[in-house]
Amino acid sequence: MNEKTDDIILAFESSADETSAAVVKNGNTILSNVVATQIASHQRFGGIVPEVASRHHLEWINRVTEEALTKAGINDPERQLSAVAATYGPGLVGSLLVGLMAGKTFAMVHHLPFIAVNHLAGHISAANFVKATVYPALAIMVSGGHTELLWMEKENTFQIIGTTLDDAAGEAFDKVGRILGLKYPAGKEIQEMAGHGKAVIKFPIAHTEDDFDFSFSGLKSSVLNYVHHHEQVSEEFNRNDVAASFQKAVVEAITEKSRLAIEKFQPKELLLGGGVAANLALRTAFENLSKEYKIELTEAPIKLSGDNAAMIGAAAYLNYKQRLFAPLDLNVDPSLNFARM
């Protein structure tokens, strides 16, 4: 590898239950992306246990780092790397600390600039592995912890125009999965069940005071009431139909709010990212929305929809171009978010 002919960044991600390190070139090419998942450790609890997650991160952070560097052919970091990046929020405080400390330590030891990355910017920046974004753009970020509409007037700028008032879409999937007796995380299994069912149950879509905000707690409660009612009166019901109807309600809620935002802000491109962006029904709905409004749509690749360090490297590159470096005494920010428009 030639000496810094490209901008190459080593990135870390550990905000929740994935321990990941990646090496990314010029913000759009993955040289390596290693992810160690903890799903099996959290399944019996029905969700992420912060203490368990932190312990796993500590066990895996050095291993994923070594593997990422080896796969990318990095044997002289100070010469071959341009910077080091890590997620510093939002997320679980103990989990965030592991990746942030790994990144800051690596940067200090190898005399490299350090870049702090907003996890949400990472999810949106995963689209850069597909193509360069045309601005202004409307980003739809749908994950386990966040559901947001973000206005991007230009590169590396994010303003919230809509957010969830309670449960995030991914959280609603997991809670409904629990109601249906599914293992955590439930998103993929609900999608599979929905494919075998019919969306014949009319679950409500919340109408919020702000045109662009979301609410999924009422939908979750409606599913719970439907299932409990049928169980209490010993009346059979089709679980696949429940899954299909719930999924349809979530997809409609997200696309309808996005439709309103498209009509008001007139973006040149739509970006879809986050773990729930792997849902095929949601992707199809946005592909149809894109065609309807004749706006280009870029979806994060399914394999990069979940938490991973490659997306952090893509977001870090945008900061690197602007020389937005962070001090090595930076701390984590578990509740980090963008400013509201």
UniProtKB/Swiss-Prot annotation:
It comes from the Bacteria. Its EC number is 2.3.1.234. GO terms for molecular function: iron ion binding; N(6)-L-threonylcarbamoyladenine synthase activity. Binds 1 Fe(2+) ion per subunit. PROSITE patterns: GLYCOPROTEASE (PS01016). It is found in: Cytoplasm. InterPro entries: ATPase_NBD, Gcp-like_dom, KAE1/TsaD, Peptidase_M22_CS, TsaD. PANTHER family: TRNA N6-ADENOSINE THREONYLCARBAMOYLTRANSFERASE, TRNA N6-ADENOSINE THREONYLCARBAMOYLTRANSFERASE, MITOCHONDRIAL. This is tRNA N6-adenosine threonylcarbamoyltransferase. The gene is tsaD.
